Amino acid sequence: MNNRLIRVLATCMALVLTAKLGTIQFQGHKETWYNLDMSKVIERTDKAVGMTGLYHVREDGVKCYGQFVIVAADPRKHGRYTLVETSLGTGVVLDVHTTDDAELIDIATAWGKGGNK
């Protein structure tokens, strides 16, 4: 199968983001994943919400804050603490990404090599 056909099938089947897929289209936005140390993001968020202990990594390797998937997004499109729908569940914007793609949602995971925290 060629890459174009795989992408069409993935879109039609509403696949969820995986480490192997790397990038998918979901409900009008592009999703990718990243694996960085989240300790500074979590520290800042804990201070902002006045709580601690909400950070955890799900069994599938997705990093979460409470019930929400941690995502990075363009702050001009999605402000910090905004909720966004992702292929892996409802996400909360706790981080920003450094691309110019306002439609990109970058999902924090423990996949591959990286921060794992």
Task: Annotate the PLM regions.
Residues 18-117:
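Solvent-exposed, well-ordered loop and adjacent helix/strand elements within mature globular domains
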Residues 1-20:
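Gram-positive cell-envelope targeting signals
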